[in-house]
């Protein structure tokens, strides 16, 4: 690569703070595509910490198979692609159509050892090429901010997995490079508008400055209310009834008993109409506040959710990488009228904490997380913190742990994600064989479910959650949920667990449309 000739210019403006990010998102973004809301909250206190919104995007980056499509959404984005074309290695084919660029990456040999596979040219390099074009001399936070999703099916590019059909338009990954960010710090009660200028074009700089002023003015206005859409018939359907799902669980248990795998996480899908996803997200956030909450508005789909589980988190300064395995689930203790019974709730928690099956399953997945990190972390740097604690949500409680390690030199956050995907709590162990069996029995792509949503930056930081407790919407909402199966699982309990996990999202959609 040649020396970086391009500088990123950051334009920042303070703006009035407002405590309701969902209302702000509705007010500023309405139904525009390539917009994204990412939120974090403190689990136990249920307090909002930070909300990041992509208000305007410069480029939409998506991938299917070994192709990456880069679509400019402004002159700012077009300038990046003009520079990018000059930086693409000859091993990668490049096509242009209507200002879009399509990159064709060589297919990865599946029989390569893990290290060679990790360093092979891959679709992840599309992001690295863009980052290498620019200098961020002042090390401004979020100067290049990529927000979006990695689908579960992205792993097919790297592993020998069955080819499946899917009815969803969800790409293997879909990310937006932010042009205009809004960052809300709920602890300090501050609001910052940040624009990233990737060009020296004077007219584009003028437009972006005017856009920043326009957003500030809008934030001084009374925020628009989220429109209500009423539905009289809101039937819940599924791709598997209880008997069918239970039958798959029993078949997989036989394979566990034969020693083919130790654990596996089959899932099923629930469907219901959802004409107003943002209203449903608002209800979900209120009823089930979670460490990670997200609302992604794409031209092909809307994705929203409240996930309890971090996928992968990486801090470039410390080079610390974190996994947060969740395994072990119980419903909250409630009376017949739905109120929380604290005594019953504590007894359920005690039973879960001391249940041999749940503890064995949880520790198996903690060990899998340790193994995932072993490939990419410095020897001796891995450790487990917060072993087997309990996080509680509106409908369920979970056993959780945190596994931490220090990333090896020469690797970045995208190497780490590629090595660890998909997370063991959504696949099983051994991971690749579990994913093969999931494909065989589920018979269709998972799409966004079980992948990850979040962001990474040019400075190397990455923060993602597993895409669970979520709804993927193309007019109809698809809510997918699974259960971790081990040799002594009780199929009826696991069938109920899959519905319990989906219930918070189902209820939010129903309550938003009554």
From Swiss-Prot:
L-tryptophan binds at residues 40, 291-293. Mg(2+) binds at residues 361, 497. The keyword Secreted does not apply. Feedback inhibited by tryptophan. Pathway: Amino-acid biosynthesis; L-tryptophan biosynthesis; L-tryptophan from chorismate: step 1/5. Its EC number is 4.1.3.27. Its cofactor is Mg(2+). Binds 1 Mg(2+) ion per subunit. Chorismate binds at residues 328-329, 449, 469, 482-484. It catalyses: chorismate + L-glutamine = anthranilate + pyruvate + L-glutamate + H(+). Heterotetramer consisting of two non-identical subunits: a beta subunit (TrpG) and a large alpha subunit (TrpE). Part of a heterotetrameric complex that catalyzes the two-step biosynthesis of anthranilate, an intermediate in the biosynthesis of L-tryptophan. In the first step, the glutamine-binding beta subunit (TrpG) of anthranilate synthase (AS) provides the glutamine amidotransferase activity which generates ammonia as a substrate that, along with chorismate, is used in the second step, catalyzed by the large alpha subunit of AS (TrpE) to produce anthranilate. In the absence of TrpG, TrpE can synthesize anthranilate directly from chorismate and high concentrations of ammonia. Belongs to the anthranilate synthase component I family. This is Anthranilate synthase component 1. It comes from Buchnera aphidicola subsp. Rhopalosiphum maidis. The lineage of its organism: Bacteria, Pseudomonadati, Pseudomonadota, Gammaproteobacteria, Enterobacterales. The gene is trpE.
């Amino acid at each position: 690569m040649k020396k970086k000739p391009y500088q990123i210019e950051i334009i920042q403006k303070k703006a009035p703070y407002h405590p309701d990010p969902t209302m702000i998102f509705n007010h500023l973004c309405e139904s525009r595509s390539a917009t994204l809301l990412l939120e974090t909250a403190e689990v136990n206190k249920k307090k909002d910490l930070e909300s990041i919104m992509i208000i305007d995007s410069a480029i939409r980056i998506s991938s299917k198979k070994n192709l990456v499509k880069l679509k400019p959404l402004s002159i700012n984005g077009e300038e990046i692609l003009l520079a990018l074309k000059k930086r693409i290695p000859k091993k990668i084919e490049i096509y242009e159509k209507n200002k879009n660029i399509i990159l064709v990456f060589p297919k990865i040999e599946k029989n390569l050892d893990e290290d060679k596979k990790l360093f092979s040219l891959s679709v992840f390099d599309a992001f690295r090429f863009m980052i290498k074009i620019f200098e961020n001399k002042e090390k401004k936070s979020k100067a290049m901010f990529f927000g979006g999703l990695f689908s579960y099916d992205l792993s097919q590019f790297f592993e020998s997995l069955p080819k499946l059909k899917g009815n969803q338009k969800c790409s293997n990954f879909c990310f937006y490079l932010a042009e205009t960010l809004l960052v809300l710090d709920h602890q300090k009660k501050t609001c910052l508008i940040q624009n990233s200028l990737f060009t020296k074009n004077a007219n584009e700089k003028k437009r972006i400055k005017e856009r920043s002023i326009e957003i500030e003015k809008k934030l001084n206005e009374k925020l628009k209310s989220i429109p209500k859409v009423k539905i009289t018939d809101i039937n819940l359907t599924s791709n598997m009834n209880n008997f069918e799902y239970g039958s798959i669980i029993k078949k997989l248990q036989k394979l566990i008993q034969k020693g083919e795998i130790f654990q596996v996480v089959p899932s099923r899908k629930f469907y219901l109409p959802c004409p107003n996803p943002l209203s449903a997200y608002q209800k979900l956030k209120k009823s089930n506040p979670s460490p990670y909450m997200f609302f992604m508005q794409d031209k092909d789909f809307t994705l929203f959710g409240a996930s309890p589980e971090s996928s992968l988190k990486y801090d470039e300064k410390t080079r610390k990488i974190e996994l947060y395995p969740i395994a072990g689930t119980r419903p909250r203790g409630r009376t017949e009228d739905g109120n929380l019974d604290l005594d019953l709730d504590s007894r359920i928690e005690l039973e879960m904490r001391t249940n041999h099956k749940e503890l064995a399953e949880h520790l198996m997945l903690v060990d899998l997380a340790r193994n995932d990190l072993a490939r990419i972390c410095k020897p001796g740097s891995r450790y487990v913190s917060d072993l087997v604690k309990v996080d509680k949500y509106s409908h369920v409680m979970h056993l959780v742990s945190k596994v931490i390690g220090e990333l090896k030199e020469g690797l970045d956050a995208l190497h780490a994600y590629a090595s660890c995907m998909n997370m063991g709590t959504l696949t099983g162990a051994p991971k690749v064989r579990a994913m093969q069996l999931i494909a065989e029995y589920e018979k269709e792509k998972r799409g966004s479910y079980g992948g990850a949503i979040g962001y990474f930056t040019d400075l190397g930081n990455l923060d993602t959650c597993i895409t669970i407790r979520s709804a993927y919407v193309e007019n109809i909402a698809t809510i997918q949920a699974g259960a971790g199966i081990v040799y002594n699982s009780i199929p009826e309990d696991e069938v109920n667990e899959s519905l319990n996990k989906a219930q918070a999202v189902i209820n939010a959609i129903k309550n938003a449309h009554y």
